[in-house]
Amino acid sequence: MRLESSLRVLNEMEAAGVIGKYAIGGAVAAFLYIEPGTTFDLGAFIALEPGAGGLIDLSPIYDYLRTRGYQPQQEGVLIEEWEVQFLPTGTPLEVEALEQAVAIEIGGTATRIFTQEHLMAICLHVGRPKDLARLVAFAQEGHPDESQLQEILRRHQLEAKWMQFRSRYLSAP
């Protein structure tokens, strides 16, 4: 599956003002830092302001994509072979990760991804089994910037959770 085609559509949406700045998070971003695994979707984090009543309205995104022949599927929209999930930044950590995302090229297509350290902090914060497994892989394979990671953990009150994670999953037998 060609990720670049989906990224080009996201870039077109950003240029058209349908979405603001976006960055790739989740498994696709993680696999640029650690050994790839299996994923079936592309997590595109976007900054959206809540509308009246505090609700976030994704309908302009879905309407734009429908006019171009893309259809909703499960939790996202199938865009050129990838199910893209549009994920509004919902926590200060995700907002910061979007603001500090790194510009890269994938197959000649420009995009942005979360830093490894932000991905690690998000995995720790979310704490699902697959996130914890990914966090172990980051610690063993990813070579994160420890000082940057510690600063992110401090800013988002995740230091105690990190110490607990390290003692449970990363300590030598």
Regions found by a protein language model. Name each.
Residues 1-173:
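Compositionally biased terminal segments of proteins
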